[in-house]
């Protein structure tokens, strides 16, 4: 049984239910200790990583939205996956800001919302990868190029992804928890039932196995098919997208598998019997880093996405630089302007004769502005 805490570690205020569960699994004392300098730096680093995740996935969404080439089914799924990663970054950032001593100022409902948002992001990401695999498989079987006008299947699959994700994330707050059954409580998530965690891991594992089977079938279809695609460029682009998605799935499995295994250990272990469960934050960080790696994979593996991504970054930089360095034209003296205008009018025919091939005014501009507007002058 858990030992009583010394008076200096007793919380002054907080929720009794949360304290009871955290004390039962052995995590109460650690949450109430003052944060050391090293843990504070780690927290700041995690917050910076989360901000970077949100920023880069937001840029992926903007790049897909602004580029008409990406308005097809495949990139809609990639955009949905970027939205899931963005949500994961926000959810983990909120989780960090509400952790530590602040945990015990939360009600069980707010605690379930805090942790459930992470499960929603995980469920949406996993289901999005499954939806991409299903779409690719159906396309390869029919051997037809993407039809931008037929998007009902895309939105149906994306809608199903979010429905499943929100359902999984809402189950604990709807009653599948261990509020009245302490021996069934998870060590990593003290208010979650071990049965619920085992159920979620089973669902996610089944989805990942299905994804691997679908991509293996797609690979063998491509290798064994004797049918030729009429447009070589479309075929090459399709295979490039396939390679990109396979890399995304592989990285997802590599990043999330350690956390899945840790949850299985949590389900199997007796309370306070497995010290590794108290180091779960590092496994969670590895899983969250997957959301930061996906945009990097898009830009490195897809030439079109790389161009759109870097064009967006360059436009933002040039626009910001132009806003900071906008020149202010000095006012002209009226008398000088009159004399100069009269001189120009008297010599204007000569100038026109001497310079018949003068470049148009649109080309006489700052180089950065020209690049921004897409104007190239000879």
UniProtKB/Swiss-Prot annotation:
Glycosylated residues, chain numbering: 15
Topological relation to the membrane, as annotated: Multi-pass membrane protein
For this UniProt entry, the molecular function terms from Gene Ontology, in alphabetical order, are:
G protein-coupled receptor activity; integrin binding; lipid binding; sphingosine-1-phosphate receptor activity
Q: Which residues form a coiled coil?
A: none
In this chain, the stretch annotated as Disordered covers 327-357
Keyword terms, alphabetized: Cell membrane, G-protein coupled receptor, Glycoprotein, Membrane, Phosphoprotein, Receptor, Transducer, Transmembrane, Transmembrane helix
Task: Tell me the residues on which Phosphoserine occurs.
Answer: 326
UniProt lists the family membership as follows: Belongs to the G-protein coupled receptor 1 family.
- Describe its function: Receptor for the lysosphingolipid sphingosine 1-phosphate (S1P). S1P is a bioactive lysophospholipid that elicits diverse physiological effect on most types of cells and tissues. When expressed in rat HTC4 hepatoma cells, is capable of mediating S1P-induced cell proliferation and suppression of apoptosis.
- This chain's protein is named Sphingosine 1-phosphate receptor 3
Please give the organism: Homo sapiens (Human)
Gene this chain is encoded by = S1PR3
